[in-house]
Protein backbone atom coordinates (compact mmCIF):
# COMPACT_ATOMS: atom_id res chain seq x y z
CA UNK A 1 0.00 0.00 0.00
CA UNK A 2 1.33 3.43 -0.95
CA UNK A 3 1.30 6.19 1.68
CA UNK A 4 2.55 8.83 -0.81
CA UNK A 5 1.70 9.04 -4.52
CA UNK A 6 3.15 11.71 -6.80
CA UNK A 7 1.69 11.93 -10.31
CA UNK A 8 3.04 14.05 -13.18
CA UNK A 9 4.37 16.76 -10.88
CA UNK A 10 5.72 20.00 -12.35
CA UNK A 11 6.90 23.02 -10.39
CA UNK A 12 7.80 26.35 -11.99
CA UNK A 13 8.92 29.35 -9.91
CA UNK A 14 9.59 32.73 -11.56
CA UNK A 15 9.72 31.12 -15.02
CA UNK A 16 12.30 28.56 -13.84
CA UNK A 17 11.18 24.93 -13.98
CA UNK A 18 12.21 23.26 -10.72
CA UNK A 19 10.45 19.87 -11.08
CA UNK A 20 9.65 18.10 -14.34
CA UNK A 21 6.98 15.40 -14.62
CA UNK A 22 7.92 13.61 -11.39
CA UNK A 23 6.09 10.31 -10.96
CA UNK A 24 6.84 8.24 -7.86
CA UNK A 25 5.08 6.18 -5.18
CA UNK A 26 6.33 5.54 -1.65
CA UNK A 27 5.16 2.36 0.06
CA UNK A 28 3.92 2.35 3.63
CA UNK A 29 6.20 0.96 6.34
CA UNK A 30 9.49 1.44 4.50
CA UNK A 31 12.39 3.89 4.45
CA UNK A 32 12.71 5.75 1.17
CA UNK A 33 15.60 7.94 0.07
CA UNK A 34 15.90 10.96 -2.21
CA UNK A 35 19.42 11.77 -3.32
CA UNK A 36 20.86 14.42 -5.60
CA UNK A 37 23.18 17.39 -5.79
CA UNK A 38 22.28 20.90 -4.66
CA UNK A 39 19.61 22.25 -6.99
CA UNK A 40 18.46 18.80 -8.10
CA UNK A 41 14.92 19.46 -6.83
CA UNK A 42 14.79 16.92 -4.02
CA UNK A 43 14.05 19.42 -1.24
CA UNK A 44 11.41 21.16 -3.36
CA UNK A 45 9.74 17.80 -3.96
CA UNK A 46 9.64 17.19 -0.21
CA UNK A 47 8.15 20.65 0.36
CA UNK A 48 5.43 19.90 -2.19
CA UNK A 49 4.63 16.61 -0.45
CA UNK A 50 4.38 18.44 2.90
CA UNK A 51 2.04 21.06 1.43
CA UNK A 52 4.45 23.97 1.90
CA UNK A 53 4.61 24.67 -1.85
CA UNK A 54 1.82 24.17 -4.39
CA UNK A 55 2.99 22.47 -7.60
CA UNK A 56 2.26 24.04 -10.97
CA UNK A 57 0.84 20.78 -12.32
CA UNK A 58 0.24 17.28 -11.04
CA UNK A 59 -1.30 15.52 -8.05
CA UNK A 60 0.10 14.49 -4.68
CA UNK A 61 -1.83 12.22 -2.33
CA UNK A 62 -0.72 11.43 1.21
CA UNK A 63 -2.53 8.64 3.02
CA UNK A 64 -5.28 8.75 0.40
CA UNK A 65 -5.95 12.50 0.56
CA UNK A 66 -4.98 14.96 -2.18
CA UNK A 67 -2.65 17.65 -0.90
CA UNK A 68 -3.96 21.15 -1.67
CA UNK A 69 -7.48 19.91 -2.40
CA UNK A 70 -8.73 17.55 0.30
CA UNK A 71 -6.13 18.67 2.84
CA UNK A 72 -3.78 21.69 2.91
CA UNK A 73 -1.15 20.08 5.11
CA UNK A 74 -1.09 16.29 5.54
CA UNK A 75 -1.83 15.19 9.10
CA UNK A 76 -0.01 12.54 11.11
CA UNK A 77 3.31 13.65 9.60
CA UNK A 78 6.53 14.65 11.36
CA UNK A 79 8.76 17.00 9.39
CA UNK A 80 12.33 18.29 9.38
CA UNK A 81 12.87 20.51 6.36
CA UNK A 82 16.28 22.23 6.26
CA UNK A 83 17.63 23.62 9.55
CA UNK A 84 15.02 23.45 12.33
CA UNK A 85 14.28 26.89 13.80
CA UNK A 86 14.25 27.23 17.59
CA UNK A 87 14.29 30.13 20.06
CA UNK A 88 18.01 30.48 20.83
CA UNK A 89 17.64 31.62 24.46
CA UNK A 90 15.35 28.74 25.45
CA UNK A 91 16.47 25.26 26.42
CA UNK A 92 15.65 22.36 24.12
CA UNK A 93 12.89 21.18 26.46
CA UNK A 94 11.38 24.67 26.72
CA UNK A 95 11.35 25.01 22.93
CA UNK A 96 9.46 21.74 22.60
CA UNK A 97 7.08 22.74 25.41
CA UNK A 98 6.28 25.93 23.52
CA UNK A 99 5.59 24.02 20.30
CA UNK A 100 3.53 21.44 22.19
CA UNK A 101 1.42 24.24 23.67
CA UNK A 102 0.70 25.60 20.21
CA UNK A 103 -0.44 22.16 19.06
CA UNK A 104 -2.50 21.68 22.21
CA UNK A 105 -2.39 17.92 22.62
CA UNK A 106 1.16 16.95 23.60
CA UNK A 107 2.02 16.38 27.26
CA UNK A 108 5.26 16.54 29.22
CA UNK A 109 5.70 12.77 29.03
CA UNK A 110 5.67 12.79 25.21
CA UNK A 111 8.25 15.60 25.11
CA UNK A 112 10.58 13.87 27.56
CA UNK A 113 10.24 10.57 25.71
CA UNK A 114 10.95 12.12 22.30
CA UNK A 115 14.10 13.86 23.61
CA UNK A 116 15.40 10.76 25.35
CA UNK A 117 14.79 8.65 22.25
CA UNK A 118 17.17 10.83 20.21
CA UNK A 119 19.80 11.00 22.95
CA UNK A 120 19.03 14.43 24.45
CA UNK A 121 18.70 15.14 28.17
CA UNK A 122 15.35 16.92 28.78
CA UNK A 123 16.67 18.31 32.10
CA UNK A 124 19.61 20.10 30.41
CA UNK A 125 19.26 23.86 30.99
CA UNK A 126 21.68 24.87 28.21
CA UNK A 127 20.26 27.34 25.71
CA UNK A 128 19.77 26.07 22.17
CA UNK A 129 22.19 28.76 20.92
CA UNK A 130 24.93 26.79 22.70
CA UNK A 131 23.92 23.48 21.15
CA UNK A 132 26.18 21.90 18.59
CA UNK A 133 24.79 21.48 15.08
CA UNK A 134 24.30 17.79 15.81
CA UNK A 135 22.33 18.52 19.00
CA UNK A 136 20.07 20.93 17.11
CA UNK A 137 19.50 18.24 14.51
CA UNK A 138 18.52 15.78 17.24
CA UNK A 139 16.18 18.36 18.74
CA UNK A 140 14.56 18.80 15.34
CA UNK A 141 13.96 15.06 15.16
CA UNK A 142 12.54 15.06 18.70
CA UNK A 143 10.11 17.76 17.54
CA UNK A 144 9.14 15.66 14.52
CA UNK A 145 8.37 12.52 16.55
CA UNK A 146 6.71 13.95 19.67
CA UNK A 147 3.20 13.44 18.23
CA UNK A 148 4.07 9.85 17.26
CA UNK A 149 3.34 10.34 13.53
CA UNK A 150 3.04 7.46 11.07
CA UNK A 151 5.07 9.33 8.42
CA UNK A 152 8.37 11.17 8.84
CA UNK A 153 9.80 13.56 6.22
CA UNK A 154 13.46 14.26 7.02
CA UNK A 155 15.82 16.59 5.14
CA UNK A 156 19.48 15.76 5.92
CA UNK A 157 18.82 14.10 9.32
CA UNK A 158 22.53 13.17 9.70
CA UNK A 159 23.76 16.72 9.13
CA UNK A 160 26.20 17.81 11.85
CA UNK A 161 26.38 14.43 13.59
CA UNK A 162 29.73 12.82 14.38
CA UNK A 163 30.45 9.17 13.55
CA UNK A 164 28.81 7.83 16.71
CA UNK A 165 25.86 10.17 16.27
CA UNK A 166 25.32 8.98 12.71
CA UNK A 167 25.43 5.35 13.87
CA UNK A 168 22.91 6.04 16.64
CA UNK A 169 20.60 7.94 14.29
CA UNK A 170 20.66 5.12 11.75
CA UNK A 171 19.76 2.59 14.44
CA UNK A 172 16.95 4.80 15.69
CA UNK A 173 15.46 5.35 12.23
CA UNK A 174 15.60 1.60 11.56
CA UNK A 175 13.80 0.98 14.88
CA UNK A 176 11.08 3.41 13.79
CA UNK A 177 10.65 1.40 10.60
CA UNK A 178 10.39 -1.81 12.63
CA UNK A 179 7.54 -0.16 14.54
CA UNK A 180 5.62 0.46 11.33
CA UNK A 181 6.67 4.04 10.54
CA UNK A 182 7.24 5.26 6.99
CA UNK A 183 10.27 7.52 6.52
CA UNK A 184 11.28 9.67 3.54
CA UNK A 185 14.88 10.91 3.78
CA UNK A 186 16.52 13.56 1.63
CA UNK A 187 20.33 13.44 1.74
CA UNK A 188 23.51 14.33 -0.11
CA UNK A 189 25.15 11.24 1.41
CA UNK A 190 24.81 8.17 -0.78
CA UNK A 191 26.19 6.10 2.11
CA UNK A 192 23.37 7.11 4.47
CA UNK A 193 20.78 6.43 1.80
CA UNK A 194 22.23 3.06 0.76
CA UNK A 195 22.53 1.83 4.37
CA UNK A 196 19.06 2.89 5.50
CA UNK A 197 16.69 2.89 2.56
CA UNK A 198 14.54 0.21 0.96
CA UNK A 199 14.17 2.37 -2.16
CA UNK A 200 16.56 5.01 -3.50
CA UNK A 201 15.37 7.76 -5.86
CA UNK A 202 17.97 9.87 -7.63
CA UNK A 203 17.15 13.36 -8.91
CA UNK A 204 18.98 15.68 -11.28
CA UNK A 205 17.82 19.08 -12.57
CA UNK A 206 14.26 18.47 -11.40
CA UNK A 207 13.96 15.08 -13.08
CA UNK A 208 13.68 11.71 -11.36
CA UNK A 209 16.52 9.89 -13.11
CA UNK A 210 16.80 6.57 -11.30
CA UNK A 211 14.84 4.41 -8.86
CA UNK A 212 16.38 1.43 -7.03
CA UNK A 213 14.48 -1.05 -4.91
PLM regions with names:
Residues 35-37:
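The feature captures the beta-strand-to-loop junction immediately N-terminal to the Walker
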Residues 50:
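Helix-to-loop junction immediately C-terminal to a conserved catalytic motif
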Residues 58-73:
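Conserved ABC transporter NBD signature motif
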Residues 97, 108-123:
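Conserved ABC ATPase "signature" region
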Residues 152-156:
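Catalytic Walker B motif of ABC-type/P-loop ATPase nucleotide-binding domains
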